[in-house]
Amino acid sequence: MNEITWSSYLLDSAVSYGGWRTRNADGGFGSGYNVTVQNALARSLNTIPARIVINMIGINESYNYLVNKYHITTAVEASDKSAAPLSIGSMTYGTTSLEMTAAYAAFGNGGYYYKPYSFYYIEDANGKVLIDNRENKGEQILSTGTAEVMRHLLMTVTTSSYGTGSSYKTSGFDTFAKTGTTDDNNDKWFVGGTPYYVAAVWYGYDIPEYISTWGNPAGAVHKTVFDAIHEDLPDKDFEDLDGAVQKEYCTDTGKLASSSCYSTAYGWYKKDNVPEYCTGHYYSSSSDDDDEEEEEKKPTQSSPPSTSAAAAGNNGGEE
């Protein structure tokens, strides 16, 4: 689907589906401003994914990806084939950290899903192989370009000053991540990956109750564990697989920057889904992204924004 890009502007306002209406984590129905896809993801806004699922991708295609591509087995078609479960994750029975880890791994490995396993291979005393996962073949569920763009998008969750995972980046390594909080603040999630490992952490109670801890304890656990296991590992970067390209874009329109654009930033795009060049500034009076732009003014892979994000904070976002 070549409609959505890093710098696509979408309206941060509630959309409805059946009897459900989107709210952001602050309880509000959105700012009423246009925001980029990247900005919405880093801040964990609910309105933007709901708008994408309902109006752009569609319920059927979204459910197909959830079940048949990402292999989430807990989905219940009768109740989860709907806007809220597919856009913000409010599934009937939730999901597991194992399946979340396997799904998110595709964003860091070029788009491949690998069925999780606990043992590489096991031999008995006579050398007979009892369990063998050495030839575990991956299934390509995303194009290389889509996976690369998603990885760069998710990296801004930890590198942007307004990102909900900015406190939980693995020390010394690029980290793509996504945070999550359920209704009534009963559950906290953090899924994060480096060039070496991917892991999902869930934090909550056996019998759900309000989590009063400040911040995201799941993110804190992830960072503690990942900092420890990466401490003695050699430097390693994510492999760029030539499916995506970094481009300068106009922060007023979301289109590729031209010589007349006075405010620009850098984003990542699939090579076959690059916006056209900007010929005017159509969003300058209706966008709140000007003071919270995504990437540094020079092209770098995971650097924080150069323009001020102080006004944004987590305004309307998840946490």
Model-derived features with residue positions:
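Extended, charge-rich, low-hydrophobicity segments
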Residues: 20, 38-39, 50-51, 64, ...
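Soluble periplasmic/extracytoplasmic beta-strand elements of cell-envelope proteins
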Residues: 9-11, 87, 200-202
